[in-house]
């Protein structure tokens, strides 16, 4: 099983409050690809196969709801996975003062399949807020699953690794 993750942040301007305090806006780009490289006849433990979806991968879909499908449309873990996300993060000012809040706009996409050529991405788009709380970062995202045609609220406390 091979899994590769990459994330980077790119400057996207600055937001300045009336008192001169400024913070950078940024674009966050993230991708994750994985593959189980074994003979087709090999029995792979289900814990080594891939599922994706949820607050940390493809928002707009429930946790681990994106996977390979049987002929009867049953979900199961697949041998190949790809996930990508682009998010614009912008500090929020209120009455001319910088706050501990940020707003975001994002697009996520992810796919899982048993053959790399069968990867069919599921896309989620949405908006959210981030709060640098005393106990750690709090994230609330409202996302639309394009293929599922469902709106989902995702809440998280803590850092993304």
Please name every model-derived segment:
Residues 127-133, 150-161:
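Outer-membrane beta-barrel "beta-signal"
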């Amino acid at each position: 099983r091979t899994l590769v993750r990459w994330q980077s942040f790119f400057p996207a301007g600055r937001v300045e409050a009336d008192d001169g305090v400024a913070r950078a806006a940024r674009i966050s780009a993230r991708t994750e690809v994985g593959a189980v490289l074994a003979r087709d006849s090999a029995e792979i433990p289900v814990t080594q196969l891939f599922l994706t979806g949820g607050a940390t991968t493809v928002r707009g879909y429930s946790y681990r709801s994106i996977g390979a499908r049987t002929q009867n449309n049953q979900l199961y873990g697949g041998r190949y996975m790809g996930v990508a996300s682009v998010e614009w993060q912008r500090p929020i000012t209120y009455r001319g003062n910088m706050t501990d809040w940020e707003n975001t706009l994002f697009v996520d996409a992810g796919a899982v399949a048993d053959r790399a050529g069968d990867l069919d991405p599921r896309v989620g788009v949405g908006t959210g807020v981030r709060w640098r709380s005393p106990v750690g970062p709090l994230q609330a995202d409202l996302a639309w699953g394009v293929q599922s045609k469902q709106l989902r609220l995702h809440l998280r406390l803590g850092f993304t690794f």
